[in-house]
Amino acid sequence: MNVLQLMQQHDTMPETYKRLSVEEMEKRVARVKRELGTRLFIPGHHYQKDEVIQFADATGDSLQLAQVAAKNKEAEYIVFCGVHFMAETADILTSDEQIVILPDMRAGCSMADMAEIEQVERAWPILQQLFGDTILPLTYVNSTAAIKAFVGVHGGATVTSSNAKKMVAWAFTQKERIFFLPDQHLGRNTAYDLGVPLEQMAVWDPITNTLQYEGDVQQIKVILWKGHCSVHENFTVKHIEHIRKTKPDMKIIVHPECSWEVVQQADDAGSTKYIIETIANAPAGSKWAIGTEMNLVNRIIQQHPDKEIVSLNPYMCPCLTMNRIDLPHLLWALESLLEGKVVNRITVPKDVAEGAMLALERMLARA
């Protein structure tokens, strides 16, 4: 079941919230936060809008928010300002007594939806027949709980863009090959950084149920699921060439969800956290073109007026699904709690959560 199907089963915000002024909504969110105190915890991903992130009790990338969720034993309600797979991860890592809420069920992730459990279960026996028991599955945290559970049960782990290199290196100590899903670009960029040549990487197409590779399949070390981030695929080599031509003294830093060609042409690449820290530590007057989500790029620009910062793609839009979480939905979810009503609760079935926990724990133990 994908996010679009799930959202049909959940509550819809009353239209009255859309007619409120920003000032009124901010005042009411602050009031609910005061009233609920430590019973409420709001984690917010870096890609969230400023109107939402201002109320976050903790901000971070996927790894940081997973760690924060795992450590929080106090909050009764966790209102997650991110996307569906992040809220699922929070539900898995927190106690049964803690309630995880996603303010808008439309906040999904197109990348996570590119790997459905039925597709993975069809692919696995074919790959086993080709390679035997030589494959360890790894999944980017940008995946459904069901995918995480599959990976956990088969001895694998989750990864984030912050620790992908460490986790892929670990995986190669366990098995001869890795099966990386759902983001082919992060998998390819990480394996290449670790010395695996492109000639030893293949792509699994879940639509045609085939392995895309020319040559002797026994040479394959990395099997990449044919998935991608719809935001980061919009950065191209042409954008880099334009910056090199018009601003030759500007450094280019991109997220590893970008294509291999873009990452190779950039000056630097790294996780959201890495990008934030790199810009923060750069000298005043330095010039940067950033290849990642637009809400974050705009926030970095505001935080560093002493530096010249632009988006690598000047026509970039924010992540549309992240943008579903807005001030009206946050206020509605919070005020519903004061009324004794829980809306849009995220609950991962116990059997799925147990398998996913195995994958997450293997990652967190090495984070």
Swiss-Prot record:
Keywords annotated in UniProt: 4Fe-4S, Cytoplasm, Iron, Iron-sulfur, Metal-binding, Pyridine nucleotide biosynthesis, Transferase
Top-level taxon of origin: Bacteria
Requisite cofactors: [4Fe-4S] cluster
A GO term from the CC aspect: cytosol
Enzyme Commission number, as recorded: 2.5.1.72
Catalytic reaction(s) noted: iminosuccinate + dihydroxyacetone phosphate = quinolinate + phosphate + 2 H2O + H(+)
Pathway: Cofactor biosynthesis; NAD(+) biosynthesis; quinolinate from iminoaspartate: step 1/1
Pfam families assigned to the protein according to its UniProt record, in alphabetical order: NadA (PF02445)
Cofactor notes: Binds 1 [4Fe-4S] cluster per subunit.
Record-listed [4Fe-4S] cluster binding positions: C109, C229, C319
Gene Ontology biological-process annotations: 'de novo' NAD biosynthetic process from L-aspartate
Keyword presence, Transferase: yes
Primary localization class, coarse: cytoplasm
Keyword field contains Mitochondrion: no
Binding site for iminosuccinate: H45, S62, Y140, V141, N142, S161, H255, P256, E257, T272
Subcellular location: Cytoplasm
GO molecular function annotations of the record: 4 iron, 4 sulfur cluster binding; metal ion binding; quinolinate synthetase A activity
InterPro entries cross-referenced by the UniProt entry: NadA, NadA_sf, Quinolinate_synth_A_type3
Family note: Belongs to the quinolinate synthase family. Type 3 subfamily.
Role according to the record: Catalyzes the condensation of iminoaspartate with dihydroxyacetone phosphate to form quinolinate.
Protein's name in the database: Quinolinate synthase
Organism name: Anoxybacillus flavithermus (strain DSM 21510 / WK1)
